[in-house]
């Protein structure tokens, strides 16, 4: 995919606190020795997520940019993605050999989706602590994302959530589209997300 469209662009969305930035951090650290990567984050009035990635050492600072969206964060990834498209263009100008751009949306609801003009692949992150009914609620993030990540599975016993119910509902709502159960704190399930990005996105190390 990256051969024909420039770098592969992966959009990562999900509600506030679901684990989007943690996933961005882990993906950068896991893939940075295999591919040329840049990271773009979206926040309403701050650049907190970008600053977190810099502090964490996810990538060098020049490969991380924070977009301040103002207003509704979903607008900046869907109806008017111009700020994010400009950020991608700037990164491509700085790093012509980019293989992968990770784009994190601002925290939003289940209706948030990425414009196909902005993202080649979309990953939607939800968390068990929000309740086991979340997959059954549907919405574009649940039903249409290329990969659904159900994070914080370790919290299920503490919040009375049934992981079996979440998996059954995810299968029912998504059909053949894949989902992954994760505990990003311990990196459980991370390898499956990485494998999905590489396989579905057509990435080849050293290409």
UniProtKB/Swiss-Prot annotation:
InterPro entries: CobW/HypB/UreG_nucleotide-bd, P-loop_NTPase, UreG. GO terms for cellular component: cytoplasm. Homodimer. UreD, UreF and UreG form a complex that acts as a GTP-hydrolysis-dependent molecular chaperone, activating the urease apoprotein by helping to assemble the nickel containing metallocenter of UreC. The UreE protein probably delivers the nickel. It holds the Pfam family cobW. It is found in: Cytoplasm. GO terms for molecular function: GTP binding; GTPase activity; nickel cation binding. Belongs to the SIMIBI class G3E GTPase family. UreG subfamily. GTP binds at residues 14-21. PANTHER family: UREASE ACCESSORY PROTEIN G. It comes from the Bacteria. SUPFAM superfamilies: P-loop containing nucleoside triphosphate hydrolases (SSF52540). NCBIfam families: ureG. Disulfide bonds: none annotated. Keywords: Chaperone, Cytoplasm, GTP-binding, Nickel insertion, Nucleotide-binding. This is Urease accessory protein UreG. Facilitates the functional incorporation of the urease nickel metallocenter. This process requires GTP hydrolysis, probably effectuated by UreG. One of its GO terms (biological process) is urea catabolic process.
